[in-house]
Amino acid sequence: TMKRLPNVCDYLDLPMQHISQHILTDMNRTDTSAHIRKVCRMFKERGMMLRTTLMVGFPGETDEDFEELMDFVAETKFDRMGAFMFCPEDGTRAAEMPNQVPEEVKQERYDRLMTLQHGISLAQNKARVGTTCRVLVEKKRGSRYVGRSEYEAPETDGSIFFGSDEPCEIGSFVNVKITGAKAYDLMGERI
């Protein structure tokens, strides 16, 4: 249904935090690992761009839990992904849980997860080279403009940097052909 609505972007942010059922249960998340996988597959099959936010180092996260998370990210190939390391908050149940993950282990897991996503994001962005998209012009930086399409959320995702032979009005939409890709940003030319 969403795909057919012209005023709805083909972009979903599903902040799932983890995929291990053990960790989801310990987090008091009501969703199941199986349901999360099903939802992600369904939206990817429909051509939706998916973003998520994941956490590493929640108390009790084992090497197996983390590897399950890595495998899930590798198979799902999120278009956009953020991650953070668990940080205990005074007075919360999680801060008092046993099996706190050491900081150096959290950092190593975070680095591995973000390295994996960097490669996925670069491949996803390279696949957009040669395509044309509608871009909201947000600002001018030097001789180039900066904007985003329906697939880049403000403040969390990368930007599209593009040149134009004609001045572009900030706040307007222009068509841009994507000519280059980095892991998180795209380059292009107005057409």
Q: Can you name each region flagged by the protein language model?
A:
Residues 85, 96-191:
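Terminal RNA-binding accessory module
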Residues 1-80, 88-105:
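Conserved non-cysteine loop/helix-boundary elements of the Radical SAM core domain that shape
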